[in-house]
From Swiss-Prot:
Catalysed conversion reaction: L-seryl-[protein] + ATP = O-phospho-L-seryl-[protein] + ADP + H(+); L-threonyl-[protein] + ATP = O-phospho-L-threonyl-[protein] + ADP + H(+)
Subunit text: Component of a late pre-40S ribosomal particle.
Residue numbers spanned by region Disordered: 313-435, 452-484
Protein name: Serine/threonine-protein kinase rio2
Organism: Dictyostelium discoideum (Social amoeba)
Family assignment from sequence similarity: Belongs to the protein kinase superfamily. RIO-type Ser/Thr kinase family.
GO CC annotation terms, alphabetical: cytosol; nucleus; preribosome, small subunit precursor
Cofactor requirement: Mg(2+)
Length: 522
């Protein structure tokens, strides 16, 4: 979204108060309801709803009423909040043209009351070209999700911290002035992007300066991570200025060597393609030495508090291991003496164990005698119960058999005959029952059956064909020809006279004589 600060002059204090209320509500709401905005803004006489309408008119708020009536900040509204704060601090007073666009930021020229030109960088994460920010950067850390505005704010904070630390340590970077939310104000570096340079007077000097800069960053415990021709500015004196720092990582990162080699190869490949310069030497990550711990001061990616604790724990373990190794020889001699004492103690323990086992066996025998008597009584009871149950089951089975015999006698099949056909023979059909039926019954095929039906039906007398004479044939041909001609003429007349209503009426009013005269012309 392009920054258009013209609407700043039309916004009142209540409007900015409402914007701040929406920003506060977005900490735990994706869409802030209107009721919450009113309570946070705390304006009188329904002024919040009026200011919401004006902010929505200038596209500073986004409205979504699908689930409930809610609003959220747009990037333009976030820009206005940051600019309002920077103006109140006296950092900038004028906003100029846009001088650069990147995959994650927009760059504008601003000026203060003294007409000193500066650069305003607005971070805009979440664009189509760079939506993998959550996977490629560690802004979220332990959080699962966050809004793009919050991620842009973290990126700006991180870049300002890196820029300030590098500037204080003498690196060729722009001068950091101030920041607020997702905006950074820095001095304007005089130069051109290296990607726009076609020819250099001293390519070897520039190449060596860039490689020395990579090594110097590594000596301070930092790796740029995106050291290419798009993030390097060069002036007319071939002096270098480094920009764009949110992706910097520490040399203690797990993939530090990969990032370091990638920065080196980017410069080598660019100089070879653009200036036909092949560097004979280039730095390697193994040769770099950490002289300063700048990554710890600014908490660069890859070196966190947990890593500091782990480093301290490892150092303590190493010290303990060294002490244990020194004492191991003395402990070996003491172990031999202890082994002899352990053998004597083991003999005494075996005697005690044997006595305990004998006592346990006697107790088990006594308990087994008592248990046998009780088990015998229980077995007798179970046998008596089983005998009684078997007798009862036999009596029930006899009663069921007698009932089934009576039901069979009562349910004897009654065969009713209708025109010599038994009705219930189809239920229990068997091939053996075919003997009872007439085996000499004729078998009639479908074809014979149909022929018999045709013979029985009455036949109509056939009409005799009447042969036509030649005169009648010619007369019929003439009639067909005349009919075809009349149809053709009517169709043509209908096509030509169809567009105009008056002509159509004239065609309908024509007499038969005119039509016949037209037909005779053929």
């Amino acid at each position: 979204m392009k920054l258009d600060p013209k609407a700043l002059r039309y916004l009142s204090k209540d409007d900015f108060r409402t914007l701040v209320a929406v920003e506060m509500g977005m900490k735990n709401h994706e869409l802030v309801p209107v009721s919450l905005i009113c309570t946070i803004a705390n304006l009188k006489y329904g002024g919040t709803k009026k200011s919401i309408q004006t902010l929505h008119k200038f596209k500073l708020l986004f409205h979504d009423g699908r689930n409930y009536d809610g609003y959220k900040l747009t990037y333009l509204g976030y820009d206005f909040l940051a600019l309002k704060t920077l103006v109140s601090r006296g950092v900038c007073s004028y906003v100029g043209n846009q001088i650069g666009v990147g995959k994650e930021s927009d760059i504008y020229i601003v000026a203060n009351d003294d007409n000193q030109e500066m650069v305003l960088k607005l971070h805009r994460l979440g664009r189509v070209s760079f939506k993998t920010i959550k996977n490629n950067r560690d802004y979220l850390k332990h959080r699962k999700s966050a809004s793009w505005l919050y991620l842009s704010r973290l990126a700006a904070l991180k870049e300002f911290a890196y820029m300030k630390a590098l500037y204080e340590n003498g690196f060729p970077v722009p001068t950091p002035i101030d920041y607020n939310r997702h905006c950074i104000v820095m001095s304007r570096a005089r130069g051109y992007p290296l990607t726009q340079i076609v020819q250099l007077r001293h390519p070897s000097k520039v190449y060596s300066d860039l490689m020395n800069l990579i090594v110097k960053l590594a000596s301070y415990g930092l790796i740029h991570g995106d050291f290419n021709e798009f993030n390097i500015l060069i002036n007319d004196e071939e002096e270098i200025t480094l920009i764009d720092f949110p992706q910097m990582v520490s040399t203690s990162h797990l993939n530090a060597e990969m990032y370091f080699d990638r920065d080196v190869t980017c410069i080598r490949v660019f100089f070879e393609k653009r200036f036909n310069f092949i560097g004979e030497r280039w730095p390697k990550f193994k040769d770099c030495q950490n002289i300063h711990s700048l990554d710890v001061e600014i908490s660069a990616s890859g070196f966190t508090r947990d890593m500091e604790k782990e480093f301290q724990d490892l150092s303590k373990q190493q010290d303990d291991d060294e002490i244990n190794n020194n004492d191991s020889d003395e402990n070996d001699e003491d172990d031999d003496e202890d082994d002899d004492d352990d053998d004597e103690n083991n003999d005494d323990d075996e005697n005690n164990d044997n006595n305990i086992e004998n006592e346990n066996e006697e107790n088990i025998k006594k308990s087994s005698k008592v248990n046998k008597k009780e088990v015998g009584k229980e077995i007798k009871k179970e046998e008596e119960e089983n005998n009684n149950s078997e007798e009862e089951d036999e009596e029930e089975e006899e009663e069921e058999d007698s009932d089934s015999e009576e039901s069979v006698e009562d349910n004897t099949p009654v065969i009713e005959e209708f025109k010599g056909l038994s009705l219930n023979k189809n239920r229990d059909f068997k091939f053996s029952n075919l003997k009872d039926e007439d085996q000499n019954a004729p078998i009639v095929l479908r074809k014979e059956f149909i022929e018999n039906l045709d013979e029985n039906q009455p036949t109509e007398p056939k009409k005799e064909k009447v042969e036509l004479t030649e005169e009648e044939k010619q007369r019929r041909k003439e009639e067909k020809r005349q009919k075809m001609i009349t149809d053709k003429v009517k169709r043509q007349l209908g096509k030509t006279m169809r567009e105009k209503v008056s002509v159509r009426n004239n065609v309908k009013s024509r007499t038969k004589k005119e039509v016949q005269a037209h037909i005779s012309s053929y």
